Amino acid sequence: LSDALIEDTGSMYVGNDPSSTTDGANYNLAVGTTALDAITTGFSNTAVGYDALTDNTDGNRNTAIGTYALKDNTTGIVNVAVGSASLDKNTTGNSNTAVGHSSAYSLTSGSSNVSMGWKSAFTVETGNNNVIIGSESNPSTDGGSTNQIVIGQGTTGKGDNMVTIGNGDITNWTA
């Protein structure tokens, strides 16, 4: 750990020192080149991977694991991104969970969304309270979708406050 920076604030940076002043940043862990690079006052963040949470300044209690995970986050709080480029464009969104490569990639400001699967909710820019499960599955609209549950590979939601299960390949339902 000769290249680790351990601060009195309880923060540890491995791989590079942040380019910002970190006096107000407490209990953060960054592992990887430019991980948590812009941190100033954010606390209790975990960033593992190249450019993970790199633009985060004031966001708190975020977890980013993977290259570019939560890369553009600045003030968003309590987000979890696991997978390269998951929640990449999030800046101010809160309480989002994205698992899978490029999951919720374009989401910038939505809150309380769950996205699981390769490129799930990939094009969604805003939206709240959505659950999107399945590779390349998306809600009905890229902006402002609310309370949609979409399950299945390549499935597109039918509208706000609706549940959509399965794509066009489903031919039979059994109970």
Q: Where are the regions that the model predicts?
A:
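Glycine- and small/polar-enriched repetitive beta-structure motifs of secreted/surface proteins
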Residues: L1-A175
